[in-house]
Amino acid sequence: MNKIYNNLNIDNLMKTEKYKYFNKEQKEEIKIGIIKCLDVSIYAKKEFDEYQMREIRYGLEDNLDVSVYAKSEFDYNQMFEIRKELEDNLNVSVYAKTELDSKEMAQSRGRMLLRKSTLL
């Protein structure tokens, strides 16, 4: 989807052709993003389910670089772990890989947090 959602209010957005292809939960995530003045064009895409949209929205709300995980190849659990690593100021390149499942990502994040705390 192009950046057609920027500068639109919710009423105008609901009238767009592309908006009707989203399910109720996806539409809600888009509405919340518009209300919070986020760039919903980043996640208002058919390839993201509502849970993935939510993780991306949370990252946008926290001014994180969501480009690291705003990819449909990541499931929402993986997105959560990458977002948490960004929030913890850890090196996301270590495990922001689709071949790692969310449990492996969580374990890696835990090890990195432990190392970080012992260095302080």
What is the meaning of each model-derived region?
Residues 1-120:
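General marker for long, soluble alpha-helical cores
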